Structures are given as structure tokens and as C-alpha cells.
Amino acid sequence: MTHILLPLSLMSATILAGVGIFLLITLLLVAILLVAKRYLVHSGNVEININSQRTVEAPSGGSLLGTMAACDIFLPSACGGKGSCGQCRVQVLDGGGEVLPTETVHLSRRQIADHWRLACQVKVRQNLDIHVDQSALDVKEWECTVISNRNVATFIKEFIVQLPAGEHMNFRPGSYAQIKIPPFSIDYDRDIDKSLIGPEYLPAWEKFGLFSLKCVNTETTVRAYSMANYPDEGDRIMLTVRIATPPFKPKPAVGFQDVNPGIASSYIFSLKPGDKVLMSGPYGDFHVDTDSKAEICLLYTSPSPRDS
């Protein structure tokens, strides 16, 4: 058998040639993508016509939900814009593109025919003509101050924030607010004030090992909670929030499973009087018709809608 040995210099030249060809192909593909992006993807600002009454200019590329929030128009989005709650509905009359499969599970055929879309799933790529409910235009966002955050049950907080001076949120029973949750890393033992839990509830927390929990949130999101105070107290917002712990490990193991606790409840339980938090509202259209004489039966799942 004959073995052909290539000179070392020839082998090095072959390797260098291969690397050079690979880099050349990579650069060529990058150049093609950049050219395609320049001519096929809209860049710069676009105009959004809202209810044929107002036109705003906004950068392209983001979701319609985020773009509207940047323009101080806050649409309901209990899931934080992930497309799972189906609440951020708007009519996109022009410029929204095709309805996505993630939207069809939340919209009926009639709604799709009437141009309803989920704002979190619509990308702002060109000028848009949209229609939103008037109630959405009345929603405001405030930097509120925590004035109380005490436990009223073993795992439930009464969370109260004060709106800025002179501000008032006009809400009705059944309305809800949204709280903006920033990225964080929370150690329950370090970051939750045990004095705000109270001596009567601390033994249960220690028994079940809640102070061993940790929670990490990597992106800004929002969560929705019903108001638990009376509408006349519109200069403050009261929420009742239950801590959302991970499920327990299957017996005979003890302790919690290695998953994140609730992001919003962990954040709220870590807040202390004097802390600042972003709240928006009021949202919701499920209200009692007080002018009706018809008998109604109300079922509720927590004290919040009852108390408000």
C-alpha cells in the first residue's frame, strides 16, 4: 500500500484556504441579510392613527402593545404581553398584517372579520390605523408609594399604595389595576420583612420552609389584581395578594419543588412602606348595572371584588 505524505506547508495552505472560504461565505451571507433588511424591513418611525382622533409617531419594530404603552395608552394585559390572556384586543383597520395562529385561539371568526387583533402579537412595521375602546384612553400609569404591606392571613398580604398628590383613579366595583414587575432576584429570607408578616403568622412560614425560597425574574412584566378598597378611596389602591408557592415535592420527600415561586406575589411580598411601584388602571368592563331592577346572583373567589 502506498502512502502519500503531503508536505507540511501544503497542509497548512489547504487549511488556511478552507478557513478563508468559510469566512468569505459567512461574510457574503451577512451582507445579503443586511441588504435584505434594509429594503424589506421598515426602519425609522411610523404613524399610528388612533380612533381617527389622534395620530402618534413611534419607532417601528416593537409590539403594538409596548408601542401604545410608550405613548401613554395602556391596554389591559394580565399576562404581560405573552399572548396567553387575550385581553389586549384592538381593532387594526390597516397595516397590521396577517392574523397569527397565537391570536386565533382568542378571537372568533366574526372578530377576525371585524379586524380585531391582540396588540401584543401585532408588530409595528408600517403606518397603522387602529381603534381602541374609549376606556383604554382613560387608563393612566403612576409611580405610587407603598404605605402598608401587612399580612392579614397566613399567606395573604393587604397591599396598599398611595397615588401621587392630586391624582385620583376613578374605578367601579369589578375594576382591576396592573402592577409592573421589574427584573429582580429575591431571597425570601433576606428580602421579605418578617415584621410585616406578623408574629401570629411567622410560625407557619417557618414550619413550611417558605424562607428557603428564592425567586428570579429576568424581564419586565405586568400582573393584574382586583381592587379591594372602596371606589371613593381613589387616591390609593388596595390589593389582597396570596403568595404563590411552588408545589410540594412528592412524598416521602419534603420541601418545595425546584421551580420559581410566583413572580408577582414574590415581588409584592418583598415591598416595604416607602418603596416605589408602577401601577396603572382602571381596567375592566365587568361591572354591576346599578340601574337595573333585575335580581342578580354574584359569586366571588376572593375578598377583593366583594370589598370594593
Predicted segments, located by residue:
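Short, strongly hydrophobic alpha-helical membrane anchors
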Residues: 1-12
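Transmembrane-cytosolic junction motif
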Residues: 31-48
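Membrane-cytosol interface motif
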Residues: 46-62
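Iron-sulfur (Fe-S) cluster-binding segments and ferredoxin-like electron-carrier domains
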Residues: 67-76, 87-137
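Ferredoxin-reductase
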Residues: 147-273
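A short, basic/flexible loop-to-alpha-helix module at the beginning of a structural domain
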Residues: 282-294
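Conserved small/polar residues in nucleotide/adenosyl-binding loops
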Residues: 300-307
